[in-house]
């Protein structure tokens, strides 16, 4: 899945640059500029649909990649793993600020709700939120800085990816048995390149199908309404890939408690290398750990479902 993530990143950066060329980061023009892109720019509709659904595939790939890392004990490459977790956090931040840019109803209210969570931090919270907003509510300054961040962060991700790969190449990659695989080394080309082409095709076909046939399947219909600070949508919820975390946030009645649980649900990944006690690296021959692992997967799926 690492290769697929790299391809996702390249696709997102290319489509994103093309979109940025036509986008206007201003509250009065953002929504109209996105509509203009889809109507009047050559293949603008396709570029936008690929960019919006490409994000979903990026998250599908990264969740599968993390799941596989957990299953096969890849987290014992501590540096690689920790940079991977930082990559996940950066990706989540990028997706969040990007979601705000079209300036639809859910963009605006999502930004309001999530940035407002920082006010739960004791003592400095309120100041922090007003500093992030650039005022007393989500408004033009917020949109402008979110666009700046959304442009910058993917290049940070690309840089971190190189560091991630550098550390991975220190140890070499893991295998399903979790044992040294020096004796099994084979040339990258044609073997791995062929295997990667299969994964590439299996990702590209659903992505293009989704972008061409039902581009709005995963989006929120509220985003077809321009942002209105005076009308709150009936259900404020993020894109599907954040629903598990959002469900955790919403299920805790205390604001600070919810924020801490939300943060912990992702940051727990940093602790995984410290929690490994087994003599075997991988879960291949550990049925008990397998049960726990698949319970975790089911748990995340249920949270995602409940969150929606």
From Swiss-Prot:
User: Localized where?
Assistant: Mitochondrion inner membrane
Query: Among the entry's GO cellular component annotations, what is one?
Result: mitochondrial inner membrane
Cofactors demanded by this protein: heme b
**Entries under InterPro entries matching the protein:** Cyt_b/b6_C, Cyt_b/b6_C_sf, Cyt_b/b6_N, Cytb/b6-like_sf, Cytochrome_b_C_euk/bac, Cytochrome_b_N_euk/bac, Di-haem_cyt_TM
Q: Cofactor note from UniProt? A: Binds 2 heme b groups non-covalently.
Which positions are annotated as binding a ubiquinone?
169
For this entry, list what GO says about its biological process: mitochondrial electron transport, ubiquinol to cytochrome c
Q: Carries keyword Flavoprotein? A: no
Binding annotation for heme b b562? 51, 150
> Which keywords belong to this entry?
Electron transport, Heme, Iron, Membrane, Metal-binding, Mitochondrion, Mitochondrion inner membrane, Respiratory chain, Transmembrane, Transmembrane helix, Transport, Ubiquinone
What membrane topology does the annotation report for this chain? Answer: Multi-pass membrane protein
User: One short Pfam family name for this protein?
Assistant: Cytochrome_B
Keyword Heme listed? The answer is yes
The protein's GO terms of the molecular function aspect are: metal ion binding; ubiquinol-cytochrome-c reductase activity
Task: List residues binding heme b b566.
Answer: 65, 164
User: In the UniProt entry for this protein, what further remark is given in the free-text comments?
Assistant: Heme 1 (or BL or b562) is low-potential and absorbs at about 562 nm, and heme 2 (or BH or b566) is high-potential and absorbs at about 566 nm.
Which family does the entry's similarity section mention? Belongs to the cytochrome b family.
Q: How does it assemble?
A: The cytochrome bc1 complex contains 11 subunits: 3 respiratory subunits (MT-CYB, CYC1 and UQCRFS1), 2 core proteins (UQCRC1 and UQCRC2) and 6 low-molecular weight proteins (UQCRH/QCR6, UQCRB/QCR7, UQCRQ/QCR8, UQCR10/QCR9, UQCR11/QCR10 and a cleavage product of UQCRFS1). This cytochrome bc1 complex then forms a dimer.
| Protein role | Component of the ubiquinol-cytochrome c reductase complex (complex III or cytochrome b-c1 complex) that is part of the mitochondrial respiratory chain. The b-c1 complex mediates electron transfer from ubiquinol to cytochrome c. Contributes to the generation of a proton gradient across the mitochondrial membrane that is then used for ATP synthesis.
Full protein name: Cytochrome b
Gene that produces this protein: MT-CYB
């Amino acid at each position: 899945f690492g290769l697929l993530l790299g391809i996702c990143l390249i696709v997102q950066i290319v489509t994103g640059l093309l979109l940025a060329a036509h986008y206007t980061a201003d509250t009065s023009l953002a929504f109209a500029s996105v509509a203009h892109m889809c109507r009047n720019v050559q293949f603008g509709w396709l570029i936008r649909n690929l960019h919006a659904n490409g994000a979903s595939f990026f998250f599908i790939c990264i969740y599968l990649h993390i799941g596989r890392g957990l299953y096969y004990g890849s987290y014992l490459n501590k540096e690689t793993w920790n940079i991977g977790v930082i990559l996940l956090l950066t990706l989540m931040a990028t997706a969040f600020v990007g979601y705000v840019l079209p300036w639809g109803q859910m963009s605006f209210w999502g930004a309001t709700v999530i940035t407002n969570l920082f006010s739960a931090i004791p003592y400095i919270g309120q100041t922090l939120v007003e500093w992030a907003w650039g005022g007393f509510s989500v408004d033009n300054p917020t949109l402008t800085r979110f666009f700046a961040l959304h442009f910058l962060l993917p290049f940070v991700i690309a840089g971190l990816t190189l560091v991630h790969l550098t550390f991975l190449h220190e140890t070499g990659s893991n295998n399903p048995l979790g044992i040294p695989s020096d004796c099994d080394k084979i040339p990258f080309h044609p073997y791995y390149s062929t295997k990667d082409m299969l994964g590439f095709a299996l990702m590209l076909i659903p992505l293009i199908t989704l972008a061409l046939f039902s581009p709005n399947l995963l989006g929120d219909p509220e985003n077809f309404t321009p942002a209105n600070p005076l009308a709150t949508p009936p259900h404020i919820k993020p894109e599907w890939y954040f629903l598990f975390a959002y469900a955790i946030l919403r299920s805790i009645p205390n604001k600070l408690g919810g924020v801490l649980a939300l943060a912990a649900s992702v940051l727990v990944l940093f602790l995984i290398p410290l929690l490994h006690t087994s003599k075997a690296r991988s879960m291949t021959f550990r049925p008990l750990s397998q049960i726990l692992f698949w319970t975790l997967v089911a748990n995340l799926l249920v949270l995602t479902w409940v969150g929606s």
